[in-house]
Every structure is written in C-alpha cells, then in structure tokens.
C-alpha cells in the first residue's frame, strides 16, 4: 500500500493543487465518521476517565486498509476527548497538515501558529496554554484505532488519531506525525466542511458544539433524529432525564445563534428532532 498525503485526498477532486484549500481560519474539513461517532464529546461534570469503546466497523469499513486486509472488527478506544480543548487541538492538527503536509506526514510549524489555528486567543500564549496543548496532544495520541481480522485476531493493526505530537517552547516549534492510512477518511464522500462560526458562537457550550458537528455531518433532508441517537453521540454520563434536558437546551442554543431551524416531536416515549434547515453562516431568520 503506497504512502499517501493529505493533499492526495483533499485535492483529489479539483483540477489544480494551486487552488486554495477550504481548511483555513474560518473552516475545517472533518471526517464524517468522527463527527457522527462519539469521539469528541462534552466534558463530563466529574473526572474524564476513559470513553466507552466505540464500534467503528461500519464507519471505517470503506478504508483501503480494512478492505485489503479483511479487517472486520474496528474499535476506537482511549481517553475521552472534549470539545472545548481536544476538538480545538484536533482542528489545529488538520489545519497544520493541510498547509504543511502536502508531501510529508511529518511536519513542523511554530507553536504560535498552531495555537492560533486551534482557535486559542493570542493572549493565552503562555505556560498554561502550552501545558493544555501538551496534554491534549497526548490524549489525541492515545485515542487508539484497532483493526482486527476475525474473532480470534488472525490479523490486526493498531494506530491512533495522531502518531506523534511534540513541541519545544524555547524553539517555538511543534512537530506532528500522522498515519497516512487514515487520510482516506477525508475523501470527498466521507468529509464535511465545518465552519467555525457556530463553534465560536457557542463558547463553553460543549453539548451544543458536539450536536452542531453531528447535525452538520448529516445528509440533506435528514431523517428525524431520536434523542437516543443524540445521547449515544454525546456519550454523557448523567441520568437519561438529565441528558434529555441537556439536549433540549443545546438545541435551543443552536436555534438562538441562527444555525438550526427545527422542531421537537414526541412519538410514544421517544423525542425526535426534525431538522427543517441548517445555516452554518448563522444568519438569523427575518
């Protein structure tokens, strides 16, 4: 299997690599699979701990490595990744590779540029932020993806969202290394363009941020979205009643900022979100 670079995927559907990437200070490209699975979730009220194991077999089955090696059991394991820090850091990682990883899967850039790409304000460029990013890169590194063939594991491959994350404050340098086998997740049919407007309009509102990334990754005219499915996506650890309250509040926040036009309908004991329209640029209805 030949090594690939993120440019091979992001540029595969355009005529010239001179065309500006859609990954910039206002947009990020993200794999649909990661946005629909409970990979980046709200921070729990108690200790983070480990996330529940996520079955990604269906979502990752289209990857070349899964097809070529016959992997039929794919799991995502590791630490819980939150929206307020870890997703921001992940956005910075994708920005960095889209800009500097056109011919290499190991890249370097200034810590200041990376922090800005993550969305952290320049006034926070201090020792506390360096520690925050250091710990976040560690969690991304430890978020494992395990491919297995057969119940008795006749073959397997272990990787993660990030292979290496290293930085030197004295040199103002950050180094990142990614697994090229995962770039395929960014193919046109499997990626979503997320605009930062909604994330910026929802500071510290992690449930609303997570639901935004989920709903934005859905196709046009999506089917009614059950609260049970949203609870699964958010991976909250509170009682079901409290989770439903959090979901309703988050939906209202998405409506308030002008992103979502929807209604909530109850069928039996289950509630459903009916999406009427989405506006990533947050234009409030007149």
Curated annotation (Swiss-Prot):
It comes from Escherichia coli. The keyword Cell wall biogenesis/degradation does not apply. The gene is repA. The lineage of its organism: Bacteria, Pseudomonadati, Pseudomonadota, Gammaproteobacteria, Enterobacterales. Belongs to the initiator RepB protein family. Keywords: DNA replication, DNA-binding, Plasmid. RepA is essential for origin function, autoregulates its own synthesis from the promoter, and, when overproduced, blocks origin function. This is Replication protein RepA. GO terms for biological process: DNA replication initiation. The keyword DNA-binding applies. Pfam families: Rep3_N (PF01051). GO terms for molecular function: DNA binding; DNA-directed DNA polymerase activity.
